[in-house]
């Protein structure tokens, strides 16, 4: 591809992911709190539910959710926010998760250990006669099972409490497809959409998040053979490079190539299930 081709695709992706050319953290906070509040009221439901991992994304989305239900209550609408801790046994960075909960200040906190369910599913797969190619493949699949068990737990609570599940996907993760389909990608509303990682951190900082939260190294921490593996190691590019791409800045050819490879390979994650009427795309 030529430089012009790269730039053309970059502009199209930025538009698709709704990344604005300018960023004002305080304005984004108010806009996103208002969005959450108006949406919940429009549904007639009463509760937001979100899993809090300890990272900046869930911390930021959680604080926005709490402020949105407080705004609704001040306006006479009964609403509340439930933060869920969803560890897989003992979380490696539990101290960070507790710090995040203190920042979010949710109305209610529920803790559900997904390890028994995730491990039982893996055992059932193995007992069925299914054989994994390698231990690494089994570990990867097991990690996605954990993410989907977390989704199940959040929807169980939402279903019982007239609730809506919040997701933490933002433009950088959406671009790279770095979420589990029907796992952490399974949600009803995405208050961080349109923000790249740099801007999520800017919102978190403006909300009063301490630097240990704002600058925590992003990790899905789903794989037991590679605990706390940073997202950037999986990408092969840094968040700064991804964010520069999303802000329309020129990046190195290797960054263009890596980003576009991840973006094209994860297109199905950003779409509703395909039918014969919409695939292949015209």
Swiss-Prot record:
The gene behind this protein is nadE
Source organism per entry reads Burkholderia cenocepacia (strain ATCC BAA-245 / DSM 16553 / LMG 16656 / NCTC 13227 / J2315 / CF5610) (Burkholderia cepacia (strain J2315))
Alphabetical list of InterPro entries matching this protein = NAD/GMP_synthase, NAD_synthase, NH(3)-dep_NAD(+)_synth, Rossmann-like_a/b/a_fold
In Swiss-Prot or TrEMBL terms, this protein is called NH(3)-dependent NAD(+) synthetase
For the ligand (Mg(2+)), the binding residues are 57, 173
Q: How does it assemble?
A: Homodimer.
Q: Which HAMAP family match?
A: NadE_ammonia_dep
Catalytic reactions on record: deamido-NAD(+) + NH4(+) + ATP = AMP + diphosphate + NAD(+) + H(+)
A cellular component term from Gene Ontology for this protein is: cytoplasm
């Amino acid at each position: 591809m030529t430089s012009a081709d790269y730039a053309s695709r970059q502009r199209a992706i930025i538009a698709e992911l709704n990344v604005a050319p300018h960023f004002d953290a305080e304005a984004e906070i108010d806009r996103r709190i208002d969005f959450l509040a108006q949406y919940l009221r429009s549904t007639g439901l009463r509760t937001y539910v979100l899993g809090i991992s300890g990272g900046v994304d869930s911390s930021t989305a959680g604080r926005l959710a709490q402020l949105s239900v407080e705004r609704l209550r001040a306006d006479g609408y009964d609403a509340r926010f439930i933060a869920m801790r969803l560890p897989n046994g003992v979380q490696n960075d539990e101290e960070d998760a507790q710090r995040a909960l203190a920042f979010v200040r949710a109305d209610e906190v529920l803790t559900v250990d997904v390890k028994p369910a995730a491990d039982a599913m893996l055992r059932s797969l193995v007992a069925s006669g299914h054989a994994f190619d390698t231990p690494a493949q089994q570990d990867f699949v097991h990690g996605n099972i954990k993410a989907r068990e977390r989704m199940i737990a959040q929807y169980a609570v939402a279903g019982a409490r007239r609730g809506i599940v919040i997701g933490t996907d933002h433009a950088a993760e959406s671009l790279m497809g770095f979420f589990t389909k029907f796992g952490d990608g399974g949600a009803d509303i995405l208050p961080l959409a349109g923000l790249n990682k740099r801007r999520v951190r800017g919102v978190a900082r403006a909300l009063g998040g301490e630097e240990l939260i704002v600058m925590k190294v992003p990790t899905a921490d789903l794989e037991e053979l590679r605990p706390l593996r940073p997202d950037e190691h999986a990408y092969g590019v840094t968040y700064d490079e991804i964010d520069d791409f999303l802000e329309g800045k020129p990046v190195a050819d290797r960054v263009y190539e890596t980003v576009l490879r991840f973006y094209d390979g994860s297109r199905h994650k950003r779409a509703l299930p395909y039918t014969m009427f919409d695939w292949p795309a015209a």
